[in-house]
Amino acid sequence: MDANNTFDSDLIHAIFKHIWARRFRERERSDAIDATEAEVALGTTKKNRLASANANALKLSCELLKSFVSEAVQRAAIIAEAEGMEKIEATHLERILPQLLLDF
């Protein structure tokens, strides 16, 4: 598959890092982390671990997002065409979203 036909892996990685950082801050604020004695002794609490993704995981994530978005647009286009419209609107995406999420 051509690299131009997929999402930029640097962008996806930046989005993942942003989400991981936000979840880390939320966990710290809520103090919901209960470290066991073994974790404290080993220094492996969730607070100490940094989330990361390797290159293959990022490529796979990009391909999955590409497939998801492509399928969403195709399904929404079918609904729009059935209604006699030339453009896809948010309501078309809203109608296909439940089944799309179940399919993925």
Swiss-Prot record:
Swiss-Prot/TrEMBL keywords: DNA damage, DNA recombination, DNA repair, DNA-binding, Nucleus
InterPro entries per the UniProt record, alphabetical: CENP-X
GO biological process: DNA recombination; DNA repair; homologous chromosome pairing at meiosis; kinetochore assembly
One annotated Gene Ontology cellular component of this protein: nucleus
Location in the cell: Nucleus
CDD domains assigned to the protein according to its UniProt record, in alphabetical order: HFD_CENP-X
Subcellular location, principal: nucleus
Domain of life: Eukaryota
Keyword set includes DNA damage: yes
MF-aspect GO terms: DNA binding
Family annotation (Pfam families): CENP-X (PF09415)
Signal sequence, start to end: none
Job of this protein: Acts in the same pathway as FANCM to restrain class II meiotic crossing over (CO), and acts with FANCM during meiosis to repair interstrand cross-links (ICLs).
Family according to the record: Belongs to the CENP-X/MHF2 family.
Protein name: Protein MHF2 homolog
Native species: Arabidopsis thaliana
Encoding gene per record: MHF2
